[in-house]
């Protein structure tokens, strides 16, 4: 039986991949590779400082944290972050699901008890995402695109939601510069589809520049 939600999704913007020309995709990949390589080199000192702070704050866990995410066409890969939570945080998820602050197939808690002191700071300024430059270098991710979801989230996806998996996921995107965690899941999906349908080099550059401003003046990050 069709629900009101199904009808809203059917009437919403649908993905059109016609604008993703070979020229755009090749240019995007070349830029991603070059920018991520330069970023990893220039930010090596920042990586070292963050690694030391993470270890001093919580010496029992690792500096880096990898998590299985789903990329283009649902292909899985290991996404890297600086660890911002206590060791064994993944095992605590089931107990915290009822406290989810985000509507839809996504899990976020504003006052997540698993986050460490250093973790709270690096998450606020998105510094925990810096290791994803390695994912960009490998081609798992792009600098700009929809955020890669967890497998457990995709299980709950509708056919409409799955449209966000038709492109390479990104480190940043319209969601991050439009309110981030202040937006609910349906709004995030709508923004992702809008990005895919209007993707171009100029739009990617605009999103990257706005991301810098969001990092400097963080809102909706937790």
What are these regions (language model features)?
Residues 102-167, 208-215:
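A short, structured surface patch at a secondary-structure boundary
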Residues 2, 18-23, 110, 160-222:
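C-terminal terminal-structure detector
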Residues 1-27:
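Flexible, Lys/Arg-rich cytosolic regulatory linkers and terminal tails that connect or flank
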Residues 36, 51, 65, 116-120, ...:
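Positions in alpha-helical segments
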Residues 2-8, 64-113, 172-190:
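Short, glycine-rich, amphipathic interfacial segments at transmembrane boundaries or analogous
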Residues 19-90, 201, 207-222:
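A hydrophobic, helix-centered structural microdomain
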Residues 32, 128-135, 192, 204:
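Acidic active-site catalytic centers that drive phospho-/nucleotidyl reactions
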